[in-house]
């Protein structure tokens, strides 16, 4: 996606106009414009020149975001709030001159404030003073007129057009009244003079501009806060690094650091690039990236990330990712891209915004004409029309979704949860089923010793010493678990000679002149006597999802060491939270059914799908999708296809780059508890968007009829000044409501809302969609092929597995089918159907 800066946009109608114009450029496949960040993301083959030209023809300015992506991402000045200071300055002078104008126009009438003697009975001077003060305020706020009339000229009216038309109408009519009053005074018609003076709307013309500026200032300030999370991430990027070159330490700008450079980090300093530690040990604070407050111990060989803080020791590292490739830059890019994309829910507001302003102008004209036809004066009718113009606010509609998306994605980034697009932030909250890969997601992904059971007089240390001595020669993952545990207990291993690895059985060797063996039950019972009690223990361990390793020395059983891929500490709690949210939790694993069920029971999942090969995960997700919206959580290369095909793919942060690229949501910390937190945040963001859209639609639906005077018979009316005040506050209310998301607690499960799904198990569903046909008469492979073809030609049949050896055809169905139809298809090929199950 190519990013562009867009200038001149003031409301949702502007962004809709730009998006429409660029989407028509040949070669553009998608275009998304963000009013919040004044940016545009374009995909396709169209040239920069063609895209920029289309934006300019629409009446706006555009430029490609220059420089390297790394520099662009690292420079927080791109998001600095430059609009608020300008608006504050405009507001200061506008309010100053408005106070003087209000003093002359209303002070003497409403509060009896004295006027300079020069103005006594000098109505023309009074009118001219009001005109001049209004002109000054209009010049101060000329941006409304330049933008508004320019957009009108390009046949793309926006919010500024409504303000400009409303203020201009009030000013022009007041100027006309001033000329007519001057003529009446020249003729000595004082009654006409007083009548025309009452038709002055100079203060309304000025008040509209000032109040809209108040609203714009509040809105700009609030919008600036929505990007605080992104700006705080950008500020984390170190500005310099200390590198080691030719034996000398040099402090260099961060953008000059190259891959494979050696850099040094002292205690208290930020790590400048992603790298691997060559020398040194330290505790590194990774809270900025993962949200984890406890520093992580690091030593030689461990990886470190840019913007994390070295808390204790001295580190010497080699850079492996620099500039735009660092973890920090990738996080910033993901958050920026999420803000640049549009959530599906925003399409409604976009469609309305595109026709909103022209519709309001038409309503204002009709309103004015109707009041004139009802016999009211021009001033009264014009006031109703102006009220319609200035109360209508497309900005509230346009901001309803993007501000919530920006705040939500920023809050997620602060907590180590990265949503790649606005759509993923919206859809995550609608998930009904969560499929969890077992290894590395529910479990820690590395086998560990869970039980040590010595036999007879053998002690734990004796068993562990013998086991570690033999396993030290093995490369098997289970062997590493035993060795690691022995090292943690400071066990000193003996030397082993004549070592042999016996595939499918175990290990053998000689230690201190004695024969030692390790392996499964079938192997060890040929080397030593196994009591029924030991067999029962092994059976129980297997039932708990653990692998029992037997060890024997010179014909005597030493004992059992159980090894298992242990469940992460937070997995059961995370699964429980998901279930409490009304989400069905399914575990996918390649383990056998017995082991898988044991782990699934410990984790607390609803359903276990065992024996799933890496290539079969994709098929399992397809079946789950028939039951509801599915999220897949995984961390490995073999999870990538399943992550892609799921409605939402969530990659655990410690996983591979392939898995992270395939996912819609990245969990920076390898915590399963971040899955319910991500769903919780998505639901809160979606709820906030609904609130914003409701307010925006409700405000305009109620406000426009009131301004038009529909409720005047009930005594409810609205003058242009109150209309402008309401308009100025509408966008501010929407943005402020979105900022409330910053107070949301992602990990607070006490307010989780349970959604009733009533979903079947996929295993139950699969059984319901399978039938086994018992057939007589099949003799060879040709018979199998004939029956298979006959069955698969039926539209309700997805696939058929036929065996002449067992005399069966196992049929997988797409839809319900009568047994008689299946029977006829087989018997038409001259075979006999005995039964169908």
Go through each PLM region and give its residues.
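Membrane-embedded alpha-helical bundles of multi-pass transporters
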Residues: 110-124, 153, 172, 411, ...
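P-type ATPase nucleotide-binding
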Residues: 449, 453-581, 593, 605-621
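Juxtamembrane coupling segments of multi-pass membrane pumps/enzymes
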Residues: 2, 181, 190-192, 206-267, ...
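Conserved cytosolic catalytic loops of P-type ATPases
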Residues: 26-43, 48-49, 53, 200, ...
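Transmembrane helix-loop-helix hairpins at the membrane interface
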Residues: 86-240, 351, 720
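Conserved catalytic phosphorylation-site environment of P-type ATPases
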Residues: 289, 348, 383, 396-470, ...
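Flexible metal-binding regulatory segments at protein termini and peripheral loops
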Residues: 1-125, 248-251, 333-341, 745-837
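Conserved ATP-binding TGD loop and adjacent catalytic N/P-domain core of P-type ATPases
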Residues: 16, 29, 267, 321, ...
């Amino acid at each position: 996606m190519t990013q562009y800066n867009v200038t001149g946009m003031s409301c949702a109608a502007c962004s809709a106009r730009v998006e429409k114009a660029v989407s028509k450029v040949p070669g553009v496949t998608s275009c998304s414009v963000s009013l919040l960040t004044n940016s545009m993301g374009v995909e396709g083959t169209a040239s920069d020149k063609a895209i920029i030209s289309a934006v300019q023809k629409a009446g706006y300015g555009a430029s490609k975001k220059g420089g390297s992506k790394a520099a662009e991402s690292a420079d927080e000045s791109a998001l600095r709030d430059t609009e608020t200071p300008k608006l504050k300055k405009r507001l200061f002078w506008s309010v100053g001159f408005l106070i003087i104008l209000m003093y002359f126009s209303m002070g003497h009438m409403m509060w009896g404030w004295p006027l300079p003697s020069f103005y006594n009975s000098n109505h023309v001077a009074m009118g001219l003073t009001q005109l001049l003060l209004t002109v000054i305020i209009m010049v101060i706020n000329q941006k409304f007129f330049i933008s508004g009339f320019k957009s009108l000229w390009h046949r793309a009216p926006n919010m500024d057009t409504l303000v400009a038309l409303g203020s201009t109408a009030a000013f022009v009519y007041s100027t006309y009244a001033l000329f007519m009053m001057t003529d009446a005074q020249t003729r000595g018609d004082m009654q006409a003079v007083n009548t025309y003076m009452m038709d002055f709307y100079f203060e309304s013309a000025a008040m509209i501009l000032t109040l809209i500026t108040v609203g714009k200032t509040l809105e700009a300030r609030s919008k600036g806060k929505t990007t605080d999370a992104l700006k705080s991430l950008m500020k984390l990027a170190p500005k310099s690094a200390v590198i080691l070159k030719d034996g000398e330490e040099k402090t260099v700008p961060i953008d000059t650091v190259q891959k494979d450079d050696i850099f040094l980090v002292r205690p208290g300093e930020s790590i400048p690039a992603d790298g691997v530690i060559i020398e040194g040990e330290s505790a590194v604070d990774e809270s900025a990236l993962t949200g984890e407050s406890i520093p992580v111990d690091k030593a030689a060989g461990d990886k470190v990330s840019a913007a994390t803080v070295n808390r204790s020791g001295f580190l010497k590292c080699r850079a492996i990712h620099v500039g735009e490739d660092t973890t920090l830059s990738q996080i910033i890019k993901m958050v920026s891209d999420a803000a640049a994309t549009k959530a599906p829910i925003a399409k409604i507001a976009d469609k309305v915004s595109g026709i909103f302003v022209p519709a309001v102008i038409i309503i204002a004209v009709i309103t004015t004409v109707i009041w004139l036809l009802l016999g009211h004066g021009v001033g009264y009718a014009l006031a109703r029309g102006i009220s319609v113009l200035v109360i209508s606010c497309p900005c509230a509609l346009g901001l309803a979704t993007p501000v919530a998306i920006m705040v939500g994605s920023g809050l997620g980034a602060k907590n180590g949860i990265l949503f790649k697009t606005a759509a993923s932030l919206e859809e995550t909250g609608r998930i009904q089923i969560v499929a969890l890969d077992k290894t590395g997601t529910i479990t820690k992904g590395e086998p560990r010793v869970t039980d040590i059971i010595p036999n007879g007089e053998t002690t734990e240390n004796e068993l562990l010493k013998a086991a570690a001595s033999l396993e030290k020669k093995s490369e098997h993952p289970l062997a590493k678990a035993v060795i690691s545990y022995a090292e943690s207990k400071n066990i000193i291993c003996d030397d082993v000679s004549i070592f042999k690895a016996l595939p499918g059985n175990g290990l053998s060797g000689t230690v201190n002149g004695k024969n030692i063996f390790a392996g499964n039950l079938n192997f060890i019972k040929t080397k030593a006597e196994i009591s029924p009690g030991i067999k029962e223990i092994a059976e129980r361990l297997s039932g708990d999802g653990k692998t029992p390793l037997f060890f024997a020395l010179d014909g005597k059983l030493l004992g059992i060491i159980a090894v298992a891929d242990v469940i992460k500490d937070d997995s059961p709690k995370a699964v429980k939270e998901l279930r409490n949210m009304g989400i069905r939790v399914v575990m996918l694993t390649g383990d056998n059914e017995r082991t898988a069920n044991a782990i699934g029971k410990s984790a607390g999942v609803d359903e276990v799908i065992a024996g799933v090969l890496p290539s079969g995960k994709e098929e399992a997700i397809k079946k789950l999708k028939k039951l509801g919206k599915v999220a897949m959580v995984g961390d490995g290369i073999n999870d990538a296809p399943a992550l892609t095909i799921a409605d939402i793919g969530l990659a655990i942060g410690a996983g591979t780059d392939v898995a992270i690229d395939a996912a819609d949501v990245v969990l920076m910390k390898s915590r399963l508890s971040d899955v319910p937190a991500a769903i919780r945040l998505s639901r809160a963001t979606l709820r906030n968007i609904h609130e914003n859209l409701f307010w925006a639609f409700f405000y305009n639906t109620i406000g426009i009829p009131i301004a038009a005077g529909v409720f005047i018979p009930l005594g409810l009316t609205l003058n242009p000044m109150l209309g402008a005040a309401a308009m100025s506050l509408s966008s501010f209310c929407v943005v402020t409501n979105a900022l409330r998301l910053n107070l949301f607690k992602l990990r607070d499960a006490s307010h989780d809302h349970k959604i009733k799904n009533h979903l079947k198990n996929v295993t139950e569903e699969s059984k319901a969609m399978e039938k086994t046909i018992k057939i007589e008469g099949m003799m060879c492979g040709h018979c199998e092929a004939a029956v298979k073809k006959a069955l698969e030609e039926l539209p309700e049949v997805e696939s058929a597995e036929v065996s002449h050896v067992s005399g069966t055809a196992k049929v997988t169905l797409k839809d319900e089918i009568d047994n008689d139809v299946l029977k006829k298809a087989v018997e038409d090929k001259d075979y006999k159907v005995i039964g169908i199950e």
